[in-house]
């Protein structure tokens, strides 16, 4: 009887045959470890999650035959991405155009200052993003935010192009205190200003969004 119980327990336990280590795209500081770990730990079948922020890697135990696409999806929903052994990707890739069109994103040319009260999305956390096409970090942050929005429909983005720091949107951003790009201002679901983020550090962006959702 005892031997049978041991056998049943063994059969019921998942067979963790594989340990997978892979690059996590988007880790830019030690504070990124908790959201990466949380995202990976949420995937069914994943155990023993370890994140190395210096090497920008994650290591997980998964069952034999596990679909690694689930890891990438979980990271994407948290604003990160994954590069598995054999792949050659260095940056977070933009979403397909049809998916981007389904997100609550409105772009403004920056020729006029934004009427903040009018552009905010009622009932949603709204990020007002002052950006420029020549700003590389702005483009990376844009892709991260769009991926994050896929799993967070309560989020909206209003993007204002500051040109070459020479238009109305640029003057407005400067008035708000922007000293560099990317520059975000986060508002809660009631339209109350919560926080600003300069530089696009992802842990700070996530913290601002979380604060707005309280």
Name each model feature, range by range:
Residues 77-106:
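N-proximal helix/coil linker or "cap" segments that precede and/or mark the start of modular domains
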Residues 37-43, 137-151:
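Typically the conserved alpha-helix immediately C-terminal to a functionally engaged Cys/Sec
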Residues 25-28, 123-126, 130-134, 180:
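Short pre-active-site segment immediately N-terminal to redox-active cysteine/selenocysteine motifs
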Residues 4-15:
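Sec-dependent N-terminal signal peptides
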Residues 73-76, 180, 186-214:
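Non-catalytic, surface beta->alpha helical segment in thiol-disulfide oxidoreductase systems
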Residues 23-70, 77:
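N-terminal targeting signals for Sec/Tat export/insertion, comprising classic cleavable signal peptides
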Residues 17-18, 105-125:
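A short beta-strand-turn-helix
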Residues 51-57, 130, 153-168:
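Thiol-based oxidoreductase modules, predominantly thioredoxin-like and allied folds used
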